[in-house]
Amino acid sequence: MKGLLALRDFRLMWAAGGLDNAGRWMDTVVMGLLVLDLTDSAFQVALLFVFRWIPMLAFALISGMIADRANRWAVMMVARFVAVASTAVILALVLTGAVEPWHVFIASFFLGCLFVMEFPSRRSLIYDLVGSERIVSAMSLETINTTIGRFAGPFMAGLLIELTGFKGPYIFLMVVYVIALVLIMVLETRGPVRVKPSYSFWSTVSRGFKYSLNNSVIRSVLIITLIMNAMAFSVESLFPVVARDHLGVGAGLTGILISAQAIGSLAAATVIASLAVVRYHGRIFCLGLGLQLLSLLFFALSPWYPLSFLMLLLAGLGAAGYSTMQSTIILISAEPEMRGTALGMLGQCIGVAAVGGLAVGIVANFFSAQAAVAMSVSLGLVLLLPAVFFSPLVRRPIAQAKEVA
């Protein structure tokens, strides 16, 4: 782990990623509470989640192709500019008192575009920097990054909203995103372009689908990811509503509650990063998702804030194992010229969270937020049992794809 942080460009990317993750989780909570304050509607809060994730569903495969062909540094720079511009517009609207829900929805969409653009390019560039032998440690450090951001972002969001209203969080977000932009700007590594720029889009799409579906390991990760994001991650959009309406707490305690997942994830990701050798990546992946789903189910059933906090902490433990191994398995299993495209396929499955977010929003509108969480997670458990049972992820180690010189 120390050796990775000794690499200048990896260290800069890691620092920028930490700031970006803190900003991403912070603006997720701030936007959710802002829309809830403006509309008092659980459905519209869930709809905000849909706007954030629909770009992943629509554009992930395209962004994966770009990662295989374009300058990955340039892609990351464009994403950083999108973050700064979107946040600046919302900040101006909040400062002038002119903000409306549709403004927040559009900003959420553009920030979703940022994530989908950067997702495969960033991970492919990390693989180029560290290689296959250190990719588990690198992805664990990425998970630690996400986890710290997942803790610091909601915590700062709740604290600043309590102290300053919605102005303080957006000023803070501007500072965070500008610093992340500067850190990416000074990278020396641009990343190799392995594929010639002339290509047929639809033949590449077809090849990406065939390649991913014919590889049993990648196919299993994609199927499980699709179920997890549709049924589990989509319910996170309702956490602010559950905190306010079911647990009866304000913005400050809501931020702390949502940060609970990060505490568990940080502990688990640190342990994974310290492992010298990981043979059964798939077992960690599957154990993680099982723990996460069960914890979310008990969170939905909990009537007490301390128990809800504990359940989200345990969900974070599971999420660390799941998310660390998710990209790692894809990167190890895919051939070099197909890594970006395979990650794009993964992004498509992650983007299904938009559909799940819409579904849980509708259920919450008719019943309650906690009922929507419980129903969605329960269905996810039922669907994942056969998906895990018939996959090769638990039975054998992940084989390394052949490198092309």
Where is each model-derived feature located?
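Helix-loop boundary and gating motifs at the non-cytosolic
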Residues: 1-55, 210, 214-259
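Short, membrane-interfacial amphipathic segments enriched in basic
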Residues: 1-8, 192-203
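Substrate-agnostic recognition of the 12-TM MFS/MFS-like secondary transporter fold
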Residues: 11-28, 51-65, 71-86, 103-161, ...
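Transmembrane alpha-helix termini and helix-breaking/packing motifs in multi-pass membrane transporters
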Residues: 32-38, 90-96, 152-172, 245-246, ...
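Helix-breaking motifs and short loop linkers at transmembrane-helix boundaries and internal kinks
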Residues: 39, 71, 93-94, 98, ...
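C-terminal transmembrane bundle of multi-pass solute transporters/carriers
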Residues: 57-62, 75, 89, 102, ...
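Helix-loop junctions on the cytosolic side of multi-pass membrane transporters
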Residues: 97, 124, 128, 170, ...
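Hydrophobic alpha-helical transmembrane segments
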Residues: 101-108, 112, 137-192, 235, ...
